[in-house]
Amino acid sequence: MTALSNMKCEACQADAPKVTDEELAELIRMIPDWGVQVRDGVMQLERIYKFKNFKLAMAFTNKLADLAEEEFHHPGIFTEWGKVTVTWWSHSIKGLHKNDFIMAAKTDQLLV
């Protein structure tokens, strides 16, 4: 399978299918530092990134904002001193789509 970070997001409409349990099991293995959370019945991907200070956390947040704009897919971002919590899910389907896994992998690449 092509690395997730090399894939592009596709337009996700309200009738797009959520990932199946089988797809979830396969895709989550490709982004091992991410966890699955369920909030208000909505499955989401989440990872906490740690930094040495607020300025580095903010720089990462800004890189992530640029990436999100390029891909037209936007995460939940919580930036605080020394860490950034990133949450991906597809708002239109209220759950996880392959796009979320692609974006999680691309987010990890921002650290490289």
UniProtKB/Swiss-Prot annotation:
TM stretches of this protein: none
Species this chain originates from: Shewanella baltica (strain OS155 / ATCC BAA-1091)
Name of the top EC class for this enzyme: lyase
The protein's Enzyme Commission number: 4.2.1.96
Domain of life according to the entry: Bacteria
Family: Belongs to the pterin-4-alpha-carbinolamine dehydratase family.
Entries under InterPro entries matching the protein: PCD_sf, Pterin-4-alpha-carb_dehyd, Pterin_deHydtase
Protein name: Putative pterin-4-alpha-carbinolamine dehydratase
Entry keyword set: Lyase
Catalytic reactions on record: (4aS,6R)-4a-hydroxy-L-erythro-5,6,7,8-tetrahydrobiopterin = (6R)-L-erythro-6,7-dihydrobiopterin + H2O
Keyword Lyase appears in the UniProt entry: yes
Any single biological process term in GO: tetrahydrobiopterin biosynthetic process
UniProt GO MF annotations: 4-alpha-hydroxytetrahydrobiopterin dehydratase activity
